[in-house]
Curated annotation (Swiss-Prot):
Location of the region described as Disordered in the Swiss-Prot/TrEMBL record: 1-64, 587-689
Expression (tissue specificity): Expressed in immature and mature dendritic cells (DCs).
Gene Ontology cellular-component terms listed: nucleoplasm; nucleus
Transmembrane portions of the chain: none
Acidic residues compositional bias, start-end: 613-627
Feature: compositional bias, Basic and acidic residues: 675-689
Localisation per UniProt entry: Nucleus
Segments carrying motif PXDLS: 587-591
Protein's GO biological process: negative regulation of intracellular estrogen receptor signaling pathway; negative regulation of transcription by RNA polymerase II; response to estrogen
Highest rank taxon of the organism: Eukaryota
A Pfam family matched in the record: zf-C2H2_6
Designated name of the protein: Zinc finger protein 366
């Protein structure tokens, strides 16, 4: 015992001498033996001496044994060599040493830090004697800022709150270490490290934190590369394993894994302790090896250097690419013990065997084949039983998928949850709303190569091209009219029924065509979205704009039959696409109700029917999709106003048309009066019998202006075109329904 005491005193001599020559050493680590030989310095700042006057600090005798290099070199040199083992000290000797050192201090003061017994250290234990120094490195790195860690039971030291940090200023010989690298794990109560965060801070309720989470610091130090923590694990010959040959391997005593490198073994041993020294500076994730951190940083950079040559899928790690390549090969190394089926990955095998255990195998009852997923099994069953049909209970329609039936039932229930924010139009499907929104943006990427008309959707352009072929493959079995598209025939069948599926939600009025409803909705707002191309006039309805351009500007939408395009086609003469540009300038707003309706003027039958017929012609004309305009100038008309038309088909005698301006009496009427007439009759079904004849006479008188003597003379085909206008109007009504079918997407 006396010999051991002498050895301790001999070690205290140079230690005290070194402590004198290092005035910059932290006050809290000053050895107690130097009090008598040097001026006593209080371990606490001036502002905190009051609350801590009843405490004193005395480090344990063995706490400074692990730092001989720090005292020998003035604290500025880092240790480069492996540390030596901590000598074993008998508990009785250690207790006597602690008793003697305690007697040197003032007997009336309580120790600030309780001194635990030194743990036993044998050759195969991890030497963490440097943990104390690492803790001070952490505090220096934080600069007095607290770090969220796993709470340890604090000791009741003082009741009143004090400033959060009272340690001295940081010193230059402590390296910058990220705080999350120090204690990302639970500190047990029997840990050899006697200090904790609560030892230096006042008693306060512990904060609930998640394990291994690091708060990002606002300083510039967090942006720097994280240094590797010097956690000391001593590897000696006891870890060596003889495997034969010249190769040396070191084995882990816990799990018996062996490595050719001591560094890899140290990293592995730290993994058993939960220590992950390498932290990501962006997300705070911890890793055991630096290479794992480098690989993890690729995910933040978006870099995937390893690419599959078969499917061009990229990965961040080579191991992931190798595992992926097993999908493209026929090698299935993992076989099921029940059915001997091979799998590329162990996870797939595990999931497959779990199905055997629970009895949920995807096996075809017809042929006995097994499938990985239930969806593949259902797809396979269609080869035996045919496609599964889901029938609608309302209209007996069949669908292949239940989702299609569900969407179809929304039409019967009039559920349209997707509403356009621009015009208030409602849709059943979200992609229908997305396609409709393109019309408000004016995006038309698809152009017809024949007439040059542009379309928003490719499907609409393909349907439009069928019109140029003039092949009408779909015929109505009631009136024997033929149509180009099947959707148009479906829309045509509304004419033969009393069903009016389109209803105004504001006034309850019903319509059998969508465009009639859309035109009617403009009446509930003050907007006039249709603007004339030649003057500042604006109109609520597109039909009114068409009539205005014909009457005021002499722009005709239809040409003559003699031009070689056939009836229902336009003359490609000038300003191609003027009517095509008659787009909706600004959508109507249902929230803007009309404050007062304008006076409705009574008009003769010819004027009212003319307004309706012109709108019918315009709406049907849009379906032809190849309309172009032919300008007309009143100054070019002959002064005599006499145009020749054949009276008889056999003689072709010419006669003068009586009062050619009689049919145009209402042209000088105010535009608002004409618009109100159209709005009053919009949405009503037209009785073609009797009214079409009057419209034909009206159109014949208006079109007679185009038969100019200077340009081209009257012809027999021109006469036939206007003579049989009443038959053409019926076809115009059907073309309106074609447009309605396109809008509905039938």
């Amino acid at each position: 015992m006396q010999k051991a005491m002498k050895m301790v005193k001999d070690e205290d001599g140079p230690l005290n001498a070194a402590a004198k020559s290092i005035p910059s050493f932290p006050h809290c680590l000053q050895p107690e033996a130097s009090r008598g030989k040097a001026p006593q310095r209080h371990p606490f700042p001036e502002a905190l001496r009051g609350p801590f006057s009843q405490f004193r600090y005395e480090p344990s005798p063995g706490d400074l044994d692990g730092f001989p290099e720090v005292f020998e070199g003035g604290g500025s040199r880092k240790r480069k060599s492996m540390p030596t083992k901590v000598p074993y000290t008998h508990p009785a000797e250690e207790a006597s040493i602690a008793q003697e050192s305690k007697s040197l201090g003032p007997p009336n003061l309580t120790l600030l830090f309780p001194q635990p017994q030194r743990p036993k250290c044998d050759s195969q234990m991890i030497d963490l004697c440097n943990v104390g120094l690492q803790f001070y490195r952490t505090l220096e790195h934080l600069g007095g800022k607290p770090v969220k860690q796993e709470p340890v039971k604090p000791s009741a030291m003082w009741p009143q709150p004090t400033p959060p940090a009272f340690l001295p200023a940081p010193y230059p010989y402590y390296p910058k270490v990220h705080p999350g690298l120090m204690f990302p794990f639970f500190v047990p109560s029997s840990s050899p490290f006697p200090f904790s965060r609560h030892t230096f801070l006042p008693k306060q309720p512990p904060e609930p934190v998640l394990p291994r989470k690091v708060e990002p610091l606002e300083s510039e130090e967090t942006k720097q590369k994280v240094e590797r923590v010097d956690v000391n694990v001593q590897i000696d010959d006891s870890y060596y394993v003889d495997v034969g040959g010249a190769q040396k391997r070191w084995q882990c005593p816990t799990c018996e894994k062996s490595y050719t490198s001591k560094y890899n073994l140290v990293t592995h041993i730290l993994g058993h302790s939960g220590i992950k020294p390498h932290a990501c500076s962006r997300c705070g994730k911890l890793f055991k090896q630096l290479s794992h951190l480098h690989t993890h940083m690729l995910t933040h950079q978006g870099t995937r250097p390893h690419k599959c040559q078969v499917c061009h899928k990229a990965f961040t790690q080579t191991s992931h690419l190798k595992r992926h390549m097993m999908q493209h090969s026929e090698v299935k190394p993992h076989n099921c013990r029940v059915c001997s089926r091979g799998f590329a990955y162990p996870s797939e095998l595990k999931a497959h065997e779990a199905k055997h255990a629970s009895g949920r195998e995807n096996i075809c009852v017809e042929c006995g084949l097994d499938f990985p997923t239930l969806a593949q099994l259902k797809r396979h069953l269609t080869t035996h039983r045919g496609p599964i049909q889901y029938n609608c209970s309302e209209c007996d329609k069949t669908f292949q998928y239940p989702s299609q039936l569900q969407n179809h039932m929304m039409k019967h229930k009039d559920i349209r949850p997707y509403i356009c924010s621009e015009c208030g139009m409602e849709f059943v499907q979200p992609h229908h709303l997305k396609q409709h929104s393109l019309t408000h943006k004016g995006v038309k990427e698809h152009k017809c190569g024949i007439c040059g008309r542009e379309f928003t959707l490719l499907a609409n352009m393909k349907r439009h091209v069928l019109i140029h072929t003039n092949i009408r493959a779909y015929q109505c079995h009631l009136c024997y009219k033929s149509f180009v598209q099947k959707q148009t025939l479906k829309a045509h069948m509304i004419v033969h029924s009393d069903v009016k599926p389109f209803k105004c939600k504001l006034c309850g009025k019903e319509f059998n065509r969508m465009h009639n409803l859309m035109g009617h909705l403009h009446l509930h707002s003050d907007s006039k979205p249709f603007k004339c191309l030649y003057c500042p006039s604006k109109f609520t309805l597109k039909g009114n704009l068409t009539r205005h351009m014909k009457v005021k500007h002499g722009v005709m939408e239809r040409g003559l039959h003699s031009q070689g395009l056939g009836r229902g086609r336009l003359v490609l003469v000038q300003s191609a696409g003027v009517l095509r540009n008659l787009e909706q300038e600004e959508p109507f707003d249902l929230s803007q109700k009309r404050s007062a309706n304008g006076p409705m003027f009574q008009s003769d039958v010819d004027s009212t029917q003319d307004c309706l017929c012109q709108e019918e012609e315009e709406e049907a004309g849009e379906e032809d999709n190849c309309y172009e305009v032919e300008p007309y100038s009143p100054s070019l008309a002959p002064e005599s106003q006499q145009l020749c038309a054949p009276e008889d088909l056999s003689t072709k005698q010419e006669q003068t048309l009586q009062d050619p301006g009689e049919g145009c009496r209402d042209q000088d009427a105010p535009e608002e009066q004409q618009e109100d007439r159209s709005e009053d009759h919009e949405g009503s079904d037209i009785d073609c019998e009797g009214k079409d004849i009057d419209c034909a006479i009206r159109e014949e008188r208006l079109s007679s202006r185009l038969l100019q003597s200077g340009g081209q003379g009257p012809s027999f085909s021109d006469y036939l075109y206007f003579k049989h206008r009443d038959e053409g109007l019926k076809e115009l009504l059907e073309r309106k329904m074609e447009k309605q079918a396109v809008l509905l997407g039938i």
